[in-house]
Regions:
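Active-site acidic catalytic loop and adjacent metal/ATP-binding pocket
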Residues: 25-45, 159-202
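Activation segment
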Residues: 50, 93, 187, 195-197, ...
Length: 293
């Protein structure tokens, strides 16, 4: 196997599956495949980044197995040329038909997050990985050759952010609509790579950031938030959810903006509409911080 470009067929054979293989995701690092996710028959196989902490991953997989009805349970953990590889039942992800029909599962997402946040944190589970994504995104921004005028508002917004609030709830750590699939007749959360104790508002922060940037329709945001609260979610206050959401939503805005413009710069492309909306949101964060001083 080429160590610089992990082969999809190798993953399928590791799972004991032959036949057509579909690459669902491939993320490249500087010189080699960082993450590779493939579907082979009725399973999905994921090669994790080099250097993934095996103890932490095993703890998260064990936690996912115990979240029946909330999170998809793994089928196994293997190794391939030093890489940790997880094997999963294949679920049915969100499709464009769902989006066009107005049946995106915002309510199910809110309900599942509320159920997750109500579960006790298993002993030995590492902290939620979501907050650590922000400094990584900023490091990526710094190394991607982003033009200074584009990077400036992101850097300025980053400087205004408060420290991450600690929390003891069981959280997903990186939730968005790509982290939910249909399986066994219902929707389930997937991808426990960042699962752990943390501030539960962080799990609502990405859609909150989209909403604040004008990238998520108000009705969709309301569907998610209403369902979350109706299911007993405690991450935010019903009377003023932004009291808890403001800081993590600003952090996710900065993270998403940094990732978007860095990705575009590496591809030699200007910021797209979504990236521009996120950068504009960073400018508003800076303006609000200046107005408050």
């Amino acid at each position: 196997m080429d160590d610089h470009r992990l082969q999809a067929g190798e993953l399928a054979r590791l799972a004991g599956r032959d036949g057509p293989v579909t690459v669902l995701k491939r993320t490249m690092g500087l010189e080699r495949t960082k993450v590779l996710v493939v579907r082979a028959g009725d399973v999905v196989v994921k090669a994790h980044p080099p250097g993934t902490d095996e103890k932490a991953l095993r703890a998260r997989l064990d936690a996912a197995r115990a979240l029946d009805g909330i999170m998809l349970a793994p089928l196994g953990l293997e190794r391939l040329d030093g890489r940790l590889v997880t094997i999963w039942p294949a679920g049915e992800p969100l499709t464009m038909d769902d989006v066009e029909a107005g049946t995106t599962p915002w309510e199910e997402g809110g309900r599942l997050l509320a159920l997750l946040h109500a579960r006790p944190v298993p002993a030995g589970l590492p902290p939620a990985g979501g907050p650590s994504r922000l400094p990584r995104a900023m490091a990526d921004l710094a190394s991607a050759g982003v033009p200074a005028p584009v990077a400036a508002p992101i850097l300025e917004a980053y400087a205004t952010l408060p420290p991450v609030r600690e929390g003891g709830a069981l959280t997903h750590g990186d939730w968005h609509l790509g982290q939910i699939v249909r399986h066994g007749g219902g929707w389930l959360l997937i991808d426990p790579d960042d699962l752990g104790p943390g501030d539960p508002a962080w799990d609502l922060a990405r859609p909150a950031a989209w909403f604040a940037a004008g990238l998520l329709a108000p009705d969709d945001w309301e569907r998610l938030l209403t369902a979350y609260l109706a299911a007993g979610g405690t991450a935010v206050s019903a009377d003023d959810p932004w009291r808890e959401l403001d800081a993590p939503a600003r952090a996710l805005t900065v993270q998403l903006a940094a990732t978007a413009v860095a990705t575009g710069a590496r591809a030699g492309e200007p910021p797209d509409d979504a990236a521009e909306a996120l950068v504009s949101a960073c400018e508003r964060i800076v303006a609000a911080a200046r107005a408050g001083t």
